[in-house]
Amino acid sequence: MKKIALLGCVCAGCLVVVGGETILSDGWQFRLEGETVLRPVTVPHDWGVEKGSLPVGSCPHQGDLPFVGKGYYRRAFDGFTPPEGGRTYLTLDGVQCRSKVILNGKVVGGRPFGYASETIDVTDALRPSGNVLEVEAENVPRSSRWYPGSGIFRDVTVRVCAADHVKPNSLFVRTLEATEASARVAVSFDWRGGTSNFTFAVENPRLWTPENPALYELELFGEKFRYGIRMAEFDPARGFFLNGVHRQMRGVCMHHDLGPLGAAFDRDVARRQLTLLKEMGCDAIRTSHNPPAAALLDLCDEMGVMVMDEAFDMWELPKGDYSNFWAEWHVRDLTEFVRRDRSHPCVVMWSIGNELSEFNEKDPSRAIRIATELTGIVKSVDGTRPVTFGSWKSDPMWNGCQNTVDAFGANYLPFKYEEFSRRNPKIGLVGTETCSTVSSRGEYFFPVVASPITCEEDLVRRRNEGREKMVRGGQMSGYDLWGPHQNDYPPDVEFEYQDRNPQVYGEFVWTGFDYIGEPDPCAKAGGRSSYFGIFDLAGFPKDRYWIYKAQWRPDVPTAHILPHWNWAGREGEVTPVHVYTSGDEAELFVNGVSQGRKQRGPHQYRFQWDEVKYTPGELRVKTWRKGRAWAEDVMRTAGEPVRVARSERRFGKLTFVTFSLVDEKGTLCPHRDRTLSFATKPGTRLVALCNGDPSSHEDFRGTSMTTFHGLLLAIVQGASEGLLPQ
């Protein structure tokens, strides 16, 4: 990280370095309404995942978890008194929801929107010692379309400032121009002397990119702020350019929960998610459908992940309950959201909403009015980034709504890309939500029925086939051919239309990871989490991972076979085999016998052998690229599980331990699941368990869980060797 020292640039000689920012994570006490005893908790905290699942079907779209209720938090503290003339600021990055903040008996803040970050000047409410901070949070039924989490689910921080300091969220660092030879950076901020603006030059700058996320430090009044130097250009005719280089964003949509940890934000878990995505070739996320944790954007800055920063899931018309607060709060919430995030180099686009109910009205005037207002608010705070929204309706492409934003956000509309750009040459286009392919890791159903998709009308036929053939007992087939809604489609379709339309800024797949709630189309069949993820809820890759890796990292040798090869009772029956590879030729072998060598055709993103008959033994694929051997993959029929294999990967304070059921040769056994129980030694804490089964209602915080197709994840704090499977 490079440092630009600008100490004293505003008032040299008056600088005072004070305590800076402190995260209040320990020392909290908590109780739910109806309880009489406070108990210790660590913040961020999510009470909804602490007590296990509600009865199946209680609230499947919120994961059958007890998120509804009212919670009370209390923390006593001394200190944080600023020097003479200084100020102390308290920031609550997210409280789910309808919060009230009380300091020493005085109400100092609160927000109805659970995802809103609130910074409060608490100087006048502080005592020299004996301070008591109280936070109330209340979730009501039907307030969210997915699992929202409960309580103080993001960081609480205190910032102590000298008299001269940068006022909260007033700093705006932006790149005016940048080449490899030089850059000019503009800085503005508010302080007690008013608003200050200045520019400075950087010679031979290291430009921020996903591949090389170089960061600099700006020092003002003794405090350090990070920024990156980069130029993002969005041209409706030519596409997206980062530092002068054309690229299409290879993005995914991300809900805010962290799987078995619920909604309580954890940097190490988020870092793992981003690492897995980047290893696949992903370079962008969309924060669907709400402002993210501020710490997530810090990670994206560090790791090189571009962000479409999204504000709302609804406007005036309801989908949850924020519409009840819209008139009073939307201007303030949107303004402060943009002010908080605008200096992050990772943020490249703003989204003012997703699939708004206003788009369903025949008369578009309400949608046009609101979108125009919101775009104006964003532009008044940050005029450097394009504004978009997400629409799964095609009418807003033509009825005037498209003119309210810089780039139209198309949800599941790849067949409209070319026409839109032709009819709207001055408006950009981005795939804000694509595919919605659903699958359960390791599940495959037969027969495999998938009619071709060559036009929009084919999607209805494919959906009807899928509903009949690809859904069974709360699980979805893993052939990656189907989605539950009318406009959904497999990854291959989006790849083709992105390739055909380089003016499109990129895509954001629905979704990167399975998330708690929205178990479409299995809500009535016992589903608890979604089926949309490229990764399951535990972070294990589904088969789709390899089709994205092959497309997004074409220079990395990749080959992957599906399905697994354990089909006792199907001997001699047709069992189609698909291969995802970055090679351009592939040959499949069953027990050494070739099933044919195939060449990749135009806009072909998978190889298929649809007439293979199941014979136990070995599946092997060999691939080539430009005539040279490229990558291989093997699937073998497994025997009975004889041991539990173990592998682990550490991120910060947490170790993610994978337990695999394997046979005597070490082959994964996806067909013989069993329950694993765990004990711990002193110095080891079992944080959570997850098997990735979207229909499982087992307790994430328990000490036992059933494997799902041979795999189980344990998240451990402390010495991982102290986790002992029984």
Q: Where on the chain are the PLM-derived regions?
A:
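Short S/T/G/P-enriched beta-strand
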Residues: 234, 550-576, 635-656, 662-665, ...
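An acidic-aromatic loop/edge-strand motif
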Residues: 24, 45-63, 112-114, 122-193, ...
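Short flexible loop/turn segments that cap and initiate beta-strands
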Residues: 211-216, 574, 582, 588-595, ...
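Beta-strand-rich structural segments
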Residues: 187-190, 219, 577-580, 622, ...
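Accessory carbohydrate-binding/adhesion or oligomerization-edge regions at the termini
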Residues: 16-59, 132-136, 158, 492-495, ...
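Short glycine/proline/serine/threonine-rich loop/turn segments at secondary-structure transition edges
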Residues: 83-86, 126-130, 144, 201-215, ...
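Accessory beta-strand-rich segments of carbohydrate-active enzymes
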Residues: 31-33, 63, 68-168, 291, ...
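Extended substrate-binding grooves/exosites of carbohydrate-active enzymes
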Residues: 43-46, 50-56, 106, 155, ...
